[in-house]
Amino acid sequence: MRKISLKGLSEIELQNLCENLSFPKFHGTQIYEWIYKHKIDSFQSMQNIPKKLVKILSETYFLNSLKIKSSSKSKIDLTTKFLLETHDNNFIETVSIIDNNRHTVCLSSQIGCNVDCDFCATGKMGIKRNLKTDEIIDQL
């Protein structure tokens, strides 16, 4: 059985999920807070969730859809580029740019690009697919 991502689900969807698993709805709110407020990366970090529910979640769902494959820091400023691998073995890039009093993050929303700029390798591959909600969230 293929696991499903919990990231991208709303608080109501997580409440309904808990209810469908025969747990009180309020655990859905707790899970929502662990994912989006505390930014946990494992189900075992959810300290106020019943162990039985944690076991079910870890067997059926996952939290992180991207793996950091590499990162490179600019030699001239505080820019860092991350190469990330998706669950289906595709690659995307995310860039963190720190400048004066600002912090900008450039997120990918698609795998590939159809612009085909001469200087960019990504455009040569065309568009493979749009990223899912959890893949966009995981870039942050």
Put a short name on every predicted segment:
Residues I92-T94, N100-S109, N114-L140:
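Conserved Radical SAM active-site core
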Residues M1-H103:
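Flexible, acidic/Gly-rich N-terminal and inter-domain linker regions that tether
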